[in-house]
Amino acid sequence: MLNEIKAKTKERMLKTIQSFHDDIKGVRTGRASASLLDGIVVNIYGGHQKLNQVAGVSVIDNKTLSIKIWDINVVGEVKNAILNANLNLNPVVEGNTIRIALPDLTQETREKLVKLLHQFAENARIAIRNIRRDIMEETEKMKENKEISEDDFHGAKKEIQNITDNNIKKIDGELSIKEKDILNH
């Protein structure tokens, strides 16, 4: 029973960590990264396609991305999707390739990005604590219904807190790395 509680806690918190990781991956640092365009969705073929399903994104140098579009007929839609993504990017079309020269980040922009990172981190911490609360309530009910003993309850409580603390440390560690990356480039 305790192993199930532990596994459930880890699984739910891992999803939160992965979501946080995806959120911060899309935040621009001073260097070009193909992951910057991961969230872009293109309206083509009567539906929505992720950019990486209609084109290959590669990094040319620290400040330039190249997008090789497989179907030349959708170049305009891809360009519009990039423009509408609110990433402050200026795509330049060259045949079936789009080049994006990333502008330098101003100090003000860097500070805004760091603020956004902190917001993502706080949301992830809150989600982790909410998961802890939910699991603790479930464990408390199990104790009240005599499904687990008092000792097992206290052991589970400690284990859940340890898992929570470790996941919050992971969030803080990723935040610190990304923050340094933004401020130092």
UniProtKB/Swiss-Prot annotation:
GO cellular component term, pick one: cytosol
GO BP terms: cytoplasmic translational termination
Keyword Protein biosynthesis: yes
Keywords in alphabetical order: Cytoplasm, Protein biosynthesis
Chief localization: cytoplasm
SUPFAM superfamilies: Ribosome recycling factor, RRF
Oxidoreductase as UniProt keyword: no
Compartment(s): Cytoplasm
GO molecular function: ribosomal large subunit binding
Function as written in the Swiss-Prot or TrEMBL entry: Responsible for the release of ribosomes from messenger RNA at the termination of protein biosynthesis. May increase the efficiency of translation by recycling ribosomes from one round of translation to another.
UniProt record similarity statement: Belongs to the RRF family.
Protein name: Ribosome-recycling factor
Species name: Wolbachia sp. subsp. Drosophila simulans (strain wRi)
